[in-house]
């Protein structure tokens, strides 16, 4: 059984162990293997959704595609840096990113616009993600 630690107003909190300069340091570059993994998934799968782990927008993209009968491959990354090497030009890529037929379709806003206009199903059929 666990014991609760009683609250004591006189007890001081432990000091932070990291130096103040560590917060200003830029994050380390992403591992090259992650970028290659995304690139391979985009080349092999008809529909790939690249997003952050637990992102609600990625969930919406996945549910929309599943509602149309597509089972997208979902790849979770830490940030846009891993995705920049996959897209030609690399600029202006936001997560979640949807790749259809090996090409970048766009984010959630572009996916919704194409879906509302009725162009999404023909694009998915052309990519081989839908058979009906």
Curated annotation (Swiss-Prot):
Q: Which SUPFAM superfamilies match?
A: Thioredoxin-like
Fetch the InterPro entries from UniProt: GlrX-like_pln_2, Glutaredoxin, Thioredoxin-like_sf
Sequence motif Responsive for interaction with TGA factors, location on chain: 129-132
Question: Where does this chain mainly localize?
Answer: cytoplasm
Q: Per the record, what is one GO cellular component?
A: nucleus
Ligand binding ([2Fe-2S] cluster):
55
Cross-referenced Pfam families? Glutaredoxin (PF00462)
Instruction: Look up the coiled coil feature and give its residue ranges.
Output: none
Sorted UniProt keywords: 2Fe-2S, Cytoplasm, Iron, Iron-sulfur, Metal-binding, Nucleus, Redox-active center
Could you cite one Gene Ontology molecular function of this protein? metal ion binding
Q: Where in the cell is it found?
A: Cytoplasm; Nucleus
Q: Where would I find the Glutaredoxin domain in this sequence?
A: 35-131
| Annotated region (Disordered), positions in chain | 16-38
Q: Family membership, please give it.
A: Belongs to the glutaredoxin family. CC-type subfamily.
What's its job? May only reduce GSH-thiol disulfides, but not protein disulfides.
Matches recorded under NCBIfam families: GlrX-like_plant (TIGR02189)
PANTHER family reported for this sequence: GLUTAREDOXIN
Q: Which protein is depicted?
A: Monothiol glutaredoxin-S9
Please tell me the species this chain comes from.
Oryza sativa subsp. japonica (Rice)
């Amino acid at each position: 059984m666990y014991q609760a630690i009683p609250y004591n107003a006189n007890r001081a909190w432990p000091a932070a162990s990291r130096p103040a300069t560590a917060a200003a340091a830029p994050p380390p570059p992403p591992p090259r293997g992650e970028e290659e993994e995304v690139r391979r998934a985009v080349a092999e799968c008809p529909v790939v959704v690249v997003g952050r782990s637990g992102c609600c927008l990625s969930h919406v993209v996945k549910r929309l595609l599943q509602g149309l009968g597509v089972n997208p491959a979902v790849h979770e990354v830490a940030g846009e840096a891993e995705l920049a090497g996959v897209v030609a030009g690399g600029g202006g890529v936001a997560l979640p990113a949807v790749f259809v037929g090996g090409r970048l379709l766009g984010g959630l806003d572009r996916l919704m616009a194409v879906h509302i206009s009725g162009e999404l199903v023909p694009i998915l059929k052309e990519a081989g993600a839908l058979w009906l």
